[in-house]
Amino acid sequence: GKMLLGESYETEYDTQEYVRELKESGVVCAVNMDGYFGQELKKMQKKQEGFEEMFFNFMQLDFSAYDEPDFCNRTETVIEESYRQGCRGIKLWKDLSLWKRDKYGKPIRTDDPRFDIIYDTAAKLHIPVLMHIADPAAFFTPKSERNERWEELDVCPEWDFSDRETYMSFEELMQMQENTVRSHPNTTFVIPHVG
Protein backbone atom coordinates (compact mmCIF):
# COMPACT_ATOMS: atom_id res chain seq x y z
CA GLY A 1 0.00 0.00 0.00
CA LYS A 2 0.74 3.69 -0.02
CA MET A 3 2.42 3.87 3.40
CA LEU A 4 5.25 1.52 2.46
CA LEU A 5 5.33 1.60 -1.35
CA GLY A 6 4.32 5.22 -2.04
CA GLU A 7 1.61 6.85 -4.12
CA SER A 8 2.24 4.62 -7.15
CA TYR A 9 1.79 1.32 -5.29
CA GLU A 10 -0.99 0.30 -7.68
CA THR A 11 1.58 -0.19 -10.46
CA GLU A 12 4.38 -1.62 -8.29
CA TYR A 13 3.26 -5.23 -8.55
CA ASP A 14 0.73 -7.50 -10.24
CA THR A 15 -1.80 -8.63 -7.62
CA GLN A 16 -2.55 -11.92 -9.38
CA GLU A 17 1.16 -12.81 -9.55
CA TYR A 18 1.65 -11.75 -5.92
CA VAL A 19 -1.26 -13.94 -4.76
CA ARG A 20 0.10 -16.88 -6.78
CA GLU A 21 3.48 -16.52 -5.03
CA LEU A 22 1.80 -16.27 -1.63
CA LYS A 23 -0.22 -19.43 -2.24
CA GLU A 24 2.84 -21.30 -3.50
CA SER A 25 4.54 -20.37 -0.22
CA GLY A 26 1.62 -21.79 1.78
CA VAL A 27 0.12 -18.45 2.79
CA VAL A 28 -3.64 -18.80 3.25
CA CYS A 29 -4.35 -15.11 3.75
CA ALA A 30 -2.40 -11.91 4.41
CA VAL A 31 -3.12 -8.97 6.69
CA ASN A 32 -2.57 -5.63 5.00
CA MET A 33 -1.71 -2.96 7.60
CA ASP A 34 -1.85 -0.25 4.97
CA GLY A 35 -5.60 -0.04 4.36
CA TYR A 36 -6.10 3.65 5.13
CA PHE A 37 -9.72 4.87 5.01
CA GLY A 38 -12.12 6.64 2.65
CA GLN A 39 -10.94 6.98 -0.96
CA GLU A 40 -7.52 5.47 -0.20
CA LEU A 41 -9.22 2.35 1.18
CA LYS A 42 -11.36 2.10 -1.95
CA LYS A 43 -8.20 2.39 -4.07
CA MET A 44 -6.59 -0.44 -2.06
CA GLN A 45 -9.67 -2.62 -2.43
CA LYS A 46 -9.64 -2.04 -6.19
CA LYS A 47 -6.02 -3.28 -6.24
CA GLN A 48 -7.16 -6.42 -4.36
CA GLU A 49 -10.25 -6.97 -6.52
CA GLY A 50 -10.83 -10.64 -7.29
CA PHE A 51 -8.65 -11.72 -4.38
CA GLU A 52 -10.70 -10.46 -1.42
CA GLU A 53 -10.49 -13.86 0.32
CA MET A 54 -6.70 -13.47 0.39
CA PHE A 55 -6.48 -10.14 2.24
CA PHE A 56 -7.67 -8.67 5.52
CA ASN A 57 -7.25 -4.90 5.55
CA PHE A 58 -6.49 -2.94 8.70
CA MET A 59 -7.52 0.71 8.60
CA GLN A 60 -5.39 3.68 9.48
CA LEU A 61 -6.80 6.79 11.11
CA ASP A 62 -6.43 10.50 10.49
CA PHE A 63 -4.84 12.32 13.42
CA SER A 64 -4.62 15.72 11.72
CA ALA A 65 -7.74 16.85 13.64
CA TYR A 66 -6.45 15.50 16.98
CA ASP A 67 -6.83 18.88 18.69
CA GLU A 68 -10.25 19.65 17.20
CA PRO A 69 -13.40 19.36 19.36
CA ASP A 70 -15.01 16.88 16.95
CA PHE A 71 -11.98 14.52 16.80
CA CYS A 72 -13.78 11.74 18.70
CA ASN A 73 -16.96 11.88 16.60
CA ARG A 74 -15.02 12.04 13.34
CA THR A 75 -12.77 9.16 14.38
CA GLU A 76 -15.69 6.96 15.41
CA THR A 77 -17.37 7.65 12.05
CA VAL A 78 -14.20 6.75 10.11
CA ILE A 79 -13.79 3.50 12.06
CA GLU A 80 -17.41 2.46 11.52
CA GLU A 81 -17.36 3.39 7.81
CA SER A 82 -14.07 1.55 7.26
CA TYR A 83 -15.48 -1.48 9.05
CA ARG A 84 -18.55 -1.41 6.78
CA GLN A 85 -16.14 -1.26 3.83
CA GLY A 86 -14.49 -4.47 5.03
CA CYS A 87 -11.62 -3.45 7.33
CA ARG A 88 -11.09 -5.94 10.13
CA GLY A 89 -8.62 -4.13 12.36
CA ILE A 90 -7.00 -0.80 13.21
CA LYS A 91 -3.28 -0.11 12.80
CA LEU A 92 -1.64 2.57 14.93
CA TRP A 93 1.80 3.19 13.43
CA LYS A 94 4.82 4.16 15.53
CA ASP A 95 4.84 7.61 13.92
CA LEU A 96 1.90 8.46 16.15
CA SER A 97 3.91 8.42 19.38
CA LEU A 98 7.32 9.19 17.88
CA TRP A 99 6.73 12.05 15.44
CA LYS A 100 3.17 13.38 15.60
CA ARG A 101 2.62 16.32 17.94
CA ASP A 102 -0.36 18.11 19.41
CA LYS A 103 -0.92 21.84 18.97
CA TYR A 104 1.45 22.51 21.89
CA GLY A 105 4.27 20.51 20.31
CA LYS A 106 3.91 17.61 22.76
CA PRO A 107 4.01 13.99 21.55
CA ILE A 108 0.59 12.42 21.00
CA ARG A 109 0.01 9.72 23.62
CA THR A 110 -1.97 6.53 22.99
CA ASP A 111 -3.26 6.67 26.58
CA ASP A 112 -4.85 10.09 26.01
CA PRO A 113 -8.58 9.85 26.91
CA ARG A 114 -9.44 11.20 23.45
CA PHE A 115 -8.26 7.85 22.09
CA ASP A 116 -10.81 5.94 24.17
CA ILE A 117 -13.19 6.24 21.22
CA ILE A 118 -10.74 4.22 19.10
CA TYR A 119 -10.39 1.39 21.61
CA ASP A 120 -14.06 1.37 22.61
CA THR A 121 -15.27 1.31 19.00
CA ALA A 122 -12.83 -1.50 18.19
CA ALA A 123 -14.19 -3.49 21.15
CA LYS A 124 -17.77 -2.83 20.06
CA LEU A 125 -16.99 -4.07 16.53
CA HIS A 126 -14.86 -7.00 17.81
CA ILE A 127 -11.81 -5.94 15.79
CA PRO A 128 -8.21 -5.76 17.06
CA VAL A 129 -6.02 -2.70 17.43
CA LEU A 130 -2.44 -3.33 16.32
CA MET A 131 -0.42 -0.75 18.24
CA HIS A 132 3.18 -0.22 17.16
CA ILE A 133 4.57 2.08 19.86
CA ALA A 134 8.35 2.08 19.56
CA ASP A 135 11.47 0.57 18.04
CA PRO A 136 14.25 -1.44 19.76
CA ALA A 137 15.29 -0.03 23.14
CA ALA A 138 18.82 0.59 21.82
CA PHE A 139 17.43 3.21 19.41
CA PHE A 140 16.44 5.28 22.46
CA THR A 141 19.93 5.38 23.96
CA PRO A 142 22.76 7.55 22.63
CA LYS A 143 24.77 6.18 19.74
CA SER A 144 28.11 4.90 20.96
CA GLU A 145 30.19 1.76 20.75
CA ARG A 146 28.37 0.57 23.88
CA ASN A 147 25.06 0.67 22.02
CA GLU A 148 24.35 -2.80 20.59
CA ARG A 149 22.71 -1.20 17.52
CA TRP A 150 25.32 1.52 16.89
CA GLU A 151 26.17 0.23 13.41
CA GLU A 152 22.50 0.40 12.37
CA LEU A 153 22.22 3.88 13.84
CA ASP A 154 25.33 4.91 11.94
CA VAL A 155 23.74 3.79 8.66
CA CYS A 156 20.23 5.05 9.56
CA PRO A 157 20.60 8.10 11.83
CA GLU A 158 16.86 8.79 11.54
CA TRP A 159 16.34 5.77 13.84
CA ASP A 160 18.08 7.56 16.70
CA PHE A 161 15.39 8.50 19.24
CA SER A 162 17.78 9.31 22.10
CA ASP A 163 17.07 13.07 22.17
CA ARG A 164 14.82 13.48 25.24
CA GLU A 165 13.87 17.01 24.14
CA THR A 166 12.24 15.48 21.06
CA TYR A 167 11.24 11.90 21.95
CA MET A 168 9.80 10.10 24.93
CA SER A 169 12.09 7.50 26.46
CA PHE A 170 11.61 3.83 25.64
CA GLU A 171 10.43 3.29 29.24
CA GLU A 172 7.85 6.08 28.93
CA LEU A 173 6.55 4.57 25.70
CA MET A 174 6.26 1.12 27.27
CA GLN A 175 4.42 2.58 30.28
CA MET A 176 2.07 4.43 27.91
CA GLN A 177 1.42 1.15 26.09
CA GLU A 178 0.75 -0.62 29.39
CA ASN A 179 -1.63 2.16 30.50
CA THR A 180 -3.53 1.89 27.21
CA VAL A 181 -3.93 -1.89 27.33
CA ARG A 182 -4.78 -2.01 31.04
CA SER A 183 -7.48 0.66 30.79
CA HIS A 184 -9.29 -1.08 27.91
CA PRO A 185 -9.84 -4.69 29.00
CA ASN A 186 -12.55 -5.32 26.39
CA THR A 187 -10.31 -4.36 23.48
CA THR A 188 -8.09 -6.87 21.72
CA PHE A 189 -4.61 -5.40 21.26
CA VAL A 190 -1.86 -6.78 19.08
CA ILE A 191 1.56 -5.55 20.19
CA PRO A 192 4.09 -6.23 17.40
CA HIS A 193 7.80 -6.89 17.68
CA VAL A 194 7.66 -8.43 21.15
CA GLY A 195 10.70 -10.51 21.88
Which residues does each PLM region occupy?
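An N-terminally biased module of ancient metal coordination in phosphate/nucleic-acid-related enzymes
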Residues: 1-50
